[in-house]
């Protein structure tokens, strides 16, 4: 396989990847789910108070809770988190306004609801618990590692405390219930948590698609997306040990994590243009005079793999690298390591490219050596075609015999190509999913490596490097039509890369430059062995 055909094969693989990716987004089969087993009496769904009672704007007091990474707003009516402002992330590049994940304004609803339902639940069709809080604004103080804020509600001799606990440097919120039964009767309640989101379509383009929708984890499924279209098609109902539910968007996620030692039910429903994905825990029985505690957790923030993996098992899988995850994870670890040394994500990408090309160099050398040997055999192969042109079986036998005698692998030029494409796909998803690259500058005009080059300079340079690499490759294609196709390859790639993240284009550009250097070094060595001639280009 010569260089021109390698480039053509790479282009076909690349285009196939884009087409397959878009097909997955538009035509993915809907998950098979069970539509029963959800009790209408006490489960948070479209007909119960846990959703319908909070379909309007906040009606209670709004309490502010803040640590060093986010600012939350909690409605005292029900104790729902109606806003989360992420202090370390800007809404727009170089903007002063902070990124708001949870919000309930301007026609957009995305809130984290939770409460107690069941036989003696305080969240029902009749209304929500109206909690009392001693203050309006709570901020984690300097030198303090945790901030605990109790919301208190009393009914029929039972004191309910919904306690929000924020930790320094963490987007993980403990949302615990303390139920003190001072009545003469045994009571039963069930905890629930759900994310309520306006039903929207996933956005993005063919080059940079983004997913907005639900996801969940269960004992049988480590991670599965459940889109808003899925929710409209059928209600999810999954009984599981542990598990979690989430709503994903580009770079950010909110997730409810129930008690991981309990048997929980995960569910979805839709109502009045809203999608709900949540959990319902097991019934908690509190005898007269007793006190019980129920533990849940809420994550609302960026997709930080290391932190999320510590909060709940498989929550880090919301950073979705697709089928190339086994390559993407070590690449991201390497990228992070280099960035910690050079303090620039663009330089880190260049560093990763150098490492990848160094690892692949033996295969690259083998590829060019194989192609050089194939070129040396062309006169003999042409002679065989003339001798056995009408006898394809005999010609194939003679060709294989020749390859064996000359110790040439006719497919030797394919292996580096087949290895390089999965690495490219893994890097693509790394750049698409890693929130660390969001608004990460390189230098000059590249101020966001996760977005396309605003002036298209990098794609043009990449196209130029591909054109140069093609011209420096020996043995031009003889077929005129194939030659025309090859001449257009750099143009086609350049057009595709106009809308790709600048970080990915940077990788491809640097990779091409390194390939050109490696190519010339390899050719010099082959010249000494008589396997290459500069005149053959």
UniProtKB/Swiss-Prot annotation:
It is a multi-pass membrane protein. Gene3D superfamilies: 2.70.98.90. It comes from the Bacteria. One of its GO terms (biological process) is protein transport. Keywords: Cell inner membrane, Cell membrane, Chaperone, Membrane, Protein transport, Transmembrane, Transmembrane helix, Transport. The keyword Transcription regulation does not apply. It is found in: Cell inner membrane. The keyword Cell membrane applies. The chain crosses the membrane at residues 6-26, 341-363, 411-431, 449-469, 490-510. GO terms for molecular function: membrane insertase activity. InterPro entries: Membr_insert_YidC (IPR019998), Membr_insert_YidC_N (IPR028053), YidC/ALB3/OXA1/COX18 (IPR001708), YidC/Oxa/ALB_C (IPR028055), YidC_ALB_C (IPR047196), YidC_periplasmic_sf (IPR038221). GO terms for cellular component: plasma membrane. Belongs to the OXA1/ALB3/YidC family. Type 1 subfamily. Interacts with the Sec translocase complex via SecD. Specifically interacts with transmembrane segments of nascent integral membrane proteins during membrane integration. Required for the insertion and/or proper folding and/or complex formation of integral membrane proteins into the membrane. Involved in integration of membrane proteins that insert both dependently and independently of the Sec translocase complex, as well as at least some lipoproteins. Aids folding of multispanning membrane proteins. This is Membrane protein insertase YidC. It comes from Actinobacillus succinogenes (strain ATCC 55618 / DSM 22257 / CCUG 43843 / 130Z). The gene is yidC.
């Amino acid at each position: 396989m010569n260089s021109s055909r390698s480039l053509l094969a790479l282009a076909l693989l690349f285009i196939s990847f884009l087409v397959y990716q878009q097909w997955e987004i538009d035509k993915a089969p809907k998950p098979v789910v069970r539509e029963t087993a959800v009790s209408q009496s006490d489960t948070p769904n479209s007909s119960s108070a846990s959703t319908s009672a909070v379909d309007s704007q906040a009606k209670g007091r709004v309490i502010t809770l803040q640590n060093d990474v986010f600012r939350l707003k909690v409605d005292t009516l029900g104790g729902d988190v109606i806003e989360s402002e992420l202090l370390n992330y800007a809404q727009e590049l170089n903007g002063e306004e902070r990124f708001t994940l949870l919000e309930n304004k301007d026609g957009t609803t995305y809130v984290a609801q939770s409460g107690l339902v069941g036989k003696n639940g305080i969240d029902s069709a009749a209304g929500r618990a109206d909690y009392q809080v001693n203050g309006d604004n709570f901020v984690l103080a300097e030198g303090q590692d945790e901030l605990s804020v109790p919301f208190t509600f009393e009914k029929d001799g039972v004191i309910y405390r919904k306690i929000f606990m924020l930790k320094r440097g963490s987007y993980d919120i403990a949302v615990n219930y303390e139920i003190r039964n001072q009545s003469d009767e045994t009571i039963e309640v069930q905890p629930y948590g759900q994310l309520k989101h306006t039903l929207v379509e996933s956005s993005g383009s063919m080059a940079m698609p983004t997913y907005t929708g639900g996801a969940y984890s269960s004992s049988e499924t480590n991670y599965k997306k459940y889109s808003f279209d899925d929710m409209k098609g059928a209600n999810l109902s999954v009984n599981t040990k542990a598990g979690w539910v989430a709503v994903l968007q580009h770079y950010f996620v909110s997730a409810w994590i129930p008690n991981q030692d309990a048997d929980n039910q995960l569910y979805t429903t839709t109502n009045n243009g809203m999608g709900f994905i949540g959990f319902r825990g097991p019934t908690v029985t509190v005898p007269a005079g007793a006190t019980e505690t129920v533990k849940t957790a809420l994550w609302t923030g960026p997709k930080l793999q290391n932190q999320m993996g510590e909060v709940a098992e498989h929550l880090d899988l919301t950073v979705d690298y697709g089928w190339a995850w086994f390559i993407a994870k070590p690449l991201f670890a390497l990228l992070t390591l280099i960035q910690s040394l050079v303090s620039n994500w663009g330089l880190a990408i260049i560093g990763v490219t150098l490492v990848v090309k160094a690892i692949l160099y033996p295969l690259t050398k083998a590829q060019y050596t194989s192609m050089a040997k194939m070129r040396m055999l062309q006169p003999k192969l042409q002679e065989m075609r003339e001798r056995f042109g009408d006898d394809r079986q005999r010609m194939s036998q003679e060709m294989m015999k020749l390859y064996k005698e000359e110790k040439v692998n006719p497919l030797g030029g394919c292996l580096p190509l087949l290895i390089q494409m999965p690495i490219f796909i893994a890097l693509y998803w790394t750049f698409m999913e890693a929130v660390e690259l969001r608004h990460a500058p390189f230098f000059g005009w590249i101020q966001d490596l996760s977005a396309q080059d605003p002036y298209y300079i990098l794609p043009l340079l990449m196209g130029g490097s591909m054109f140069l690499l093609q011209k420096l490759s020996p043995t031009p294609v003889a077929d005129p039509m194939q030659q025309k196709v090859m001449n257009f390859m750099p143009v086609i790639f350049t057009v595709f890369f106009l809308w790709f993240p600048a970080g990915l284009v940077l990788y491809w550009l640097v990779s091409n430059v390194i390939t050109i250097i490696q190519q010339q070094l390899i050719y010099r060595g082959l010249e000494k062995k008589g396997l290459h001639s500069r005149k053959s280009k």
